Structures are given as structure tokens and as C-alpha cells.
Amino acid sequence: MSRGTLFDKVWDLHTVATLPSGQTQLFIGLHLIHEVTSPQAFSMLRDRGLTVKFPGRTVATVDHIVPTENQARPFADSLAEEMIVTLERNCRENGIRFYNIGSGSQGIVHVIAPEQGLTQPGMTIACGDSHTSTHGAFGAIAFGIGTSQVRDVLASQTLALSKLKVRKIEVNGELQPGVYAKDVILHIIRKLGVKGGVGYAYEFAGSTFAAMSMEERMTVCNMAIEGGARCGYVNPDQITYDYLQGREFAPQGEAWDRAIAWWESLRSEADAEYDDVVVFDAAEIAPTVTWGITPGQGIGITETIPTPDSLLDEDRAVAAEAYSYMDLEPGAPLQGTKVDVCFIGSCTNGRLSDLREAAKVAQGRKVAAGIKAFVVPGSERVKQQAEAEGLDQIFTAAGFEWRQAGCSMCLAMNPDKLEGRQISASSSNRNFKGRQGSASGRTLLMSPAMVAAAAIAGEVTDVRNWLN
């Protein structure tokens, strides 16, 4: 029986059966696939003589392995080319909608689905990618799955899942200038830990989230997984509806009015029951940068790197590992740390509003000597919109490279990689060892505006000093 949260309502509406194991057989309303985790799933289908049950509920694109500097086919990387050819064939043979390079709609899977109106409140959404929680910004229940589960969704449009607990995370108050959605989620993960959300869905609530745009909410929900939560969501509201209205796959006419009435009914009740509630004050959140090897190892820009005696016992071992790997001293400031590469993009921060905020910092300034700085739009549509606004010219005039759409340096599956012990100021979502392509490369996570400021200064700096 529903406890009155959006999570419980959507879960119950999509429950096909309760399995003998106690798990729920859950219907999946939208399945997103890409070139990395889908080939084996299609092979398993063929091996078992199965077909895609509801091809109209699956949408595909290429993002992880595509180069962002030169996207001419065939790719120089023969494996990358083979993966895309395989996805093209699998989609063609199974009647699956596919957004390929040059279609005008290709991009990172978690960018293109919302911008086309595919992602809607009340949906269950699955994708073979960790950051599927992004779509929860719309009031959907969205989660990443493994390759065998991709197979299961293709074959049955359902998954066997254990129901999650629900934690309400309230942030109230107005964010300070120079503090962005990225800082909010990094602050939450810092306080609750990278394992704090294990077994939970996070409901993001409070006046701070109510004031956020959809793209800001997507940034927050995108990184719920980095705090251990399986998914994160925001209740749909007028901001959600205004974003969706008129988009290609959004309901139209009378169907639109019916949809809003239904979406409104899904919102968590005022007396909803949560497993626990955590409250934060927006005024306490500063521009935040990670110093270590997990997204939970973050500090406000004016703080110093924590010393072992200031940490909980369970955090000291990974902190010691981080001090050594990052070559940073406990008690030292992170501000002023020299950087080598500055990357703006990813499914966390590669949307139009992210590029606008970074461009405000870059405008009229120059990238510091010796810094490699580049901007990678999250989709072909974002790229087109940014160019229509002249953002590309602002970046290139400042010395940034302006690239094609793709996942880029968020992960080491394409030509955009760190080299050796380079330090990256990155707007992406993970700072694990080797994440950006070099086994010894170092990643500092921050907002796009902070990355732009680091590129200009040549070092980690407080973006508030760069805002006109």
C-alpha cells in the first residue's frame, strides 16, 4: 500500500507482480540504450531466440565512445566504429528509434531524452548507465541497470527489483551568487557520504529545489547515485510542465491537460511517510570542489583539505589513499592548486544553462598559458542552441576548444583523456582513480563556472571573484 510518496505511487502503478523472492516485477515505461552496454544484451536475445517485446519503448543513441574533435566516419578507432555499426544494425533489425551522429538529435543519452520530451513525470525509466537517475528530475523513477538487465527489459519490458526505502532531502533557502546545483549535490554527498544512500531513493525537496530550473534539477538527480542512492527525484511542478510543453514527445492538446492532472496526482502527499528526513540550509553551501578520489571528498572553496583527526574512523583509510594519490597535503588549501586540463561537459553539466554560466566567466578573458580547456555540448541540439546564442564564439575567443557532442572526458572510452599525472578541473560526476583516462591522472570535480574560472586562472579559484 502506498505511503503517499511519489516513489511509492509510481512503483505501485508499475508493479506487474510480487515474485516469490519478494522482489517486484516492475514494468519499465522507457528504456534508453547506447553503444556500450547494449551489444551483449542483443546477442543474448538472439542466442535465446527472443525478440524485443516493445521496440517503441526503447530509444537509442551513441555517446560514450564517440570522438568529439572529429566525428567523420569511419572512426580512426576501429573498435569504436564497430560498436556504432553494431548498434545501428541492432536498432534497424528491431525497429528501435536511433539518434545517430549528424541526425541533429544525437547526444548523451541523459541529455537527449529530456530535451525531446521523452522523459516525463510518473515514468519508470531504465538504462545501462549509472547516471540514469538524471531523469528523476521530472518526477520519474529512473535507475541504471547492468547488461543482463538490459536484455531483460528488451525481452519483457520488465525488471525484477527490490523496493527501496525513501529518504527526503530538504534544502531550504536561497543559494549565494556563484553557488550552483553542482555545489548543492556535492555538499549533500559530502555530508551524507558516498554510501549513505545505499538502499534508498532520494526525494529532493524544499524551497531551494523548488526554485531550480529543470536543468539544475537534472544535475542534482544525476549525482544521486554518487551518494549511494539507486535513484533521486523531484516532485513535478509548473517548472516541469513549462519545460515539457511543446516538446516533440510531450502530450499535446487535450492529452496535455489530462497528463498534467495525472502528474499532479503523483506528487508526494503533505503527510507522506518517509524512512528518514535530512534538512540542509542553502546559505551554508559554498562553491565546492572535490580534493580526493570519491565525490564525497569535497570542501568549500575557502576551506582546507581535512586532516585525518577531523574525519570519522571509517573515512580515514580512503582519505590516506587520496592524500597519496592526489599528492595533496592535509590542512592545505585547495584554492591555488595548479591544473592542466579544464573540461566543461558531461551528462551532469553539458546542458545549455551550464554553458551559459561558464560563458559568463569566460567572456572577455583568456585561458591561462599551458592550459588545455575545452567545452563539449551534451547534445547536437545543445550545440546548435549554444551557437545560435554565440556561446561558441565566447569560448573560442577565450581560448577554449569547441567540440562535438559526446560523453568526452567524463570517462576513458574515447580520445579525450588525461595524460600522466595531469590534474583536471572537470564538470563531470566521478573523480575515481583513472576515471579520465590516465592511470595516474587526477580529477577535481566542480561546477562549469568554476571550471571556466580555473581555466582562466590556471588554478583552482573561487568563481565568486570572477563574476562581473
UniProtKB/Swiss-Prot annotation:
Similarity annotation: Belongs to the aconitase/IPM isomerase family. LeuC type 1 subfamily.
Keyword Cell membrane belongs to the record: no
Primary enzyme class: lyase
Chain segments annotated as transmembrane: none
Protein name: 3-isopropylmalate dehydratase large subunit
Reactions catalysed: (2R,3S)-3-isopropylmalate = (2S)-2-isopropylmalate
Entries under PROSITE patterns matching the protein: ACONITASE_1, ACONITASE_2
Cofactor binding note: Binds 1 [4Fe-4S] cluster per subunit.
Organism this protein belongs to: Synechococcus elongatus (strain ATCC 33912 / PCC 7942 / FACHB-805)
Upper lineage: Bacteria, Bacillati, Cyanobacteriota, Cyanophyceae, Synechococcales
UniProt keyword annotation of 4Fe-4S present: yes
